[in-house]
Amino acid sequence: MYRYISFIWNAADPQATETAHFLQNTFTDMSSAWQTAYDGSGLCVLHRDEEPNRMQAYALSTQDENSGGVVVGKLLTRDRRPEAVSRNAHITVPEARRVIHTSGRALVEDYWGTYVAFFQRGPRKYVLVDPMGQLPCYKTGYRGVEIYFTYMPDVAACRFLDFSIDWPVIAKGLIYPVDHTRVPICEMTKIKSGECVTITPEGTVKTFYWNPQKITQTDVIEDVDEASRTLRQTILATVTSMAAPYDGAIDMIGGLDSSILMAALAQVPAPFKLTGLNSYEEDPGGDERYYVRQTCHHLGVPLIEHKAEVSRFTVHGDDMVPITPWPTDHCVAPTYKKFIHDRLTEIGGEVIFNGSGGDEMLYCHGKNYAVIDYLKTHGIRPPLFRLIMEASRMQQRSVWSILPSIMRDGFGKNRIEAVAAQPTSLLTAQVQDMVEAERQREEQTVHPWLEFRENVTPGKIDHIEPLIFGQYKREEAMVPEHFFETLRPYLSLPVIETCLRIPLWVLLADGKGRGLARKAFKDLLPPEVVWRSSKSLSGKYFWSYTLANLDKFRELLMDGELVREGLLDRASLEKTLNRDHDIELRDFAGVHSYVSAELWARKMKGETFADIVRSNVA
């Protein structure tokens, strides 16, 4: 598992300098695996478990005094041609100088990948996270030294660092979809995807160089055939670029997005070997084997099938689940991830490919945004009426029921739908007050990617919005022994930028979710797979798991940290999580996330796996 840790301090401060040297020695003494990637005046970067061409350090060597740095992660050269395969970067002295003299802008303009850059120019220090932020960057501090890191167990091992839970952030995550840009630990923050932090003796400034809104207005592709050809070329070239360092991989195949991904991976030249892995449930809504088998047979790819069995509630210890910056599943996911790791080892594979981000980037949503965007950019023209009919069919609603909102939003002020709350009767009234105060504080600062600028349309804001919340992140909730690298081509910069340049009504070609992607890859997949309309509803597995372990969950939660902090109502838990009581679906759906938050909170407060076992809940 590749990871890094960086220290930034004011080199003119003797006490901070002494502390920085103490921290460096602490980590190198803990393990000889920690190596120095960069050591400058007030900036030091350590890393470990480097694999050249996969995850490594790229030196920013300028040969100038007090100027230089390093990029950690995976960096590829940019080529604006959609069919061009990118190569692993090698940064020359002139290129390093350009990166540093542009305060990192050149890194975003000339390269792409999964990386964090640390560099300096005189007393100014910079931390730059790639636009997708899949290699996380967290920050804490100690005695005048800023500490940046990617894997929390590394800093948690330092007993002199104290961490405490930020309960309002936890509360918000129980009601709204989790925003991984906020860390529920008081002493930690997360550097956002695409954010550049400039640290000077006078203070800190945060900037975003990558501008997705501007991309939506640049070289727009409205012709369906051209868009289809460009999307296909980009996905094929990107997948080939990402697969290049590996000889074998598993594609986590299930839905249409991962089937298209498998079709692209099947084009990667030998000696690359591909295997499919499909996890299915007994419930028909969670079983996609009919389509998966067709795809694998058509492409000649061997398939591993894994049945998701409902198991007894078991809390896995630190040997399976490390301490994480956010609540994570301690029950089901660790065993499944170990299963994937073991299968990858068996076949001699080295990496997992995952279709995450396909729903959002290839665009599958049956909303009105495609019609609204067309109306705002083209006005009332003949294609508008076809688009209205397609939107009606996708939403399974009448034209007359969607037309008023289309007219209102098409001619009115730009806006997007607010994220809906998901409260349950198990939460206390205090939680809502806590969450509202937290939301009001957050709403004072709108993320620059979501501000209506650059003549951007509401649909393109909806297209961009999932990228800001950090939902797509490296598998940090894994111990190094079971770690496997996961690559997500749909969340790579070349694919994202291509999709952003294509209007939504073109992405929804033929009035179908991912319609353009279907058209682009229809010759590589069986027709039944290309034109399938069903999608797995895997949530029923967790309902079954919750029902099977209801007594243990009730016992765990009733006297737990979430009750003690006033987030969950003990009386409601006792009444609702009872097999003799009819449980509402909304209450049922939240229980598993409450259990994850409870176990995480106990671990954060110092409880060990053995403590939880002794409490008779595991």
Each predicted region: which residue ranges?
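Short, motif-level signal for alpha-helix interfacial/capping segments enriched in acidic residues
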Residues: 111, 233-234, 334, 468-473, ...
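Acidic, carboxylate-rich catalytic segments that either coordinate divalent cations
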Residues: 559-618
